[in-house]
Amino acid sequence: MAEELKKTTKEKTPVKKSSKVSASKAPTKKVTKTTEVKKADKLEKVSKPKSESTKVSKVSVKSVKTESIKSEPVKTKKSKIKVLSSKTNEAKNILFKNTVSLPKGIFGLSEEKINTQAIFDSILFERASQRQGTHSTKTRSEVSGGGKKPWKQKGTGRARAGSTRSPIWVGGGITFGPKPQKKYDFKINKKVRNLAFLSSLTLLANKNAILVEDLKLEKISSQELIKKLEDLKINNLKKILIVSDDEKIFKSGRNVQNLHVVKLNSLTVELLNETHALLLSKKDLTTLESRVK
């Protein structure tokens, strides 16, 4: 028994030595961790200036882009107008070469004098004055028939009825319907209307959307008119307004979808605000000047 106990003690002692060895190895692992942390810090320090350089390069690119964007509209303001085409709905730049200079009294109002509220009020005034007010409905007394009592007052079990033209019945009269005595028009001062007209013309002139051109046709033909608009490079616009007294232009332009031909007397503020291009003759310009004066 004593020998067996000695053997067991001998076997236990090397286990203690192994624990000491493991304890001695443990700090080496900690050292490796600290070295790895130091290496990572060095890599971050090396990588930081690169990221800063990339940021600087990005900022420089943005500044170049903004400068190029700001410089574009300054060039186009004087000569071009951006309009949506009717076929592709894409913006197009159109250059109008006017041989006649537009008078400043009509087309040169300052930004302070341009009044959008006057434009809005005048459009409402024009729409209200276009309403004729001829709508009408018939009351139970105006509808034909219905003089006979449909059934007797008592004994049928039905509700009482005195006429088949009662508003409750199908085919009867209408209660509180519209009558032609109503008027929708209202008044606006002449100064406000003139201000709206001039401000809408100046807005078109600021966009360079006014072209002074004497259109003439040999015969009534929509194809010839379209060819002339193609020569002016405005045939694909959504809305073109031509001011002319010529009957040939008026009749040949009725078949064109995006074209509206109007006399100078019937030119309205709403039409001026809807159009993308306005065609005027020299004669109409002189008449406009005389009216304003």
From Swiss-Prot:
GO terms for cellular component: ribonucleoprotein complex; ribosome. The keyword Isomerase does not apply. Signal peptide: none annotated. It comes from the Bacteria. One of its GO terms (biological process) is translation. Keywords: Ribonucleoprotein, Ribosomal protein, RNA-binding, rRNA-binding. Residues 1-72, 130-166 are annotated as: Disordered. InterPro entries: Ribosomal_uL4, Ribosomal_uL4-like, Ribosomal_uL4_dom_sf. GO terms for molecular function: rRNA binding; structural constituent of ribosome. Residues 1-14, 33-55 have a biased composition (Basic and acidic residues). Pfam families: Ribosomal_L4 (PF00573). Belongs to the universal ribosomal protein uL4 family. One of the primary rRNA binding proteins, this protein initially binds near the 5'-end of the 23S rRNA. It is important during the early stages of 50S assembly. It makes multiple contacts with different domains of the 23S rRNA in the assembled 50S subunit and ribosome. Part of the 50S ribosomal subunit. HAMAP family: Ribosomal_uL4_B. This is Large ribosomal subunit protein uL4. The lineage of its organism: Bacteria, Bacillati, Mycoplasmatota, Mycoplasmoidales, Metamycoplasmataceae. The gene is rplD.
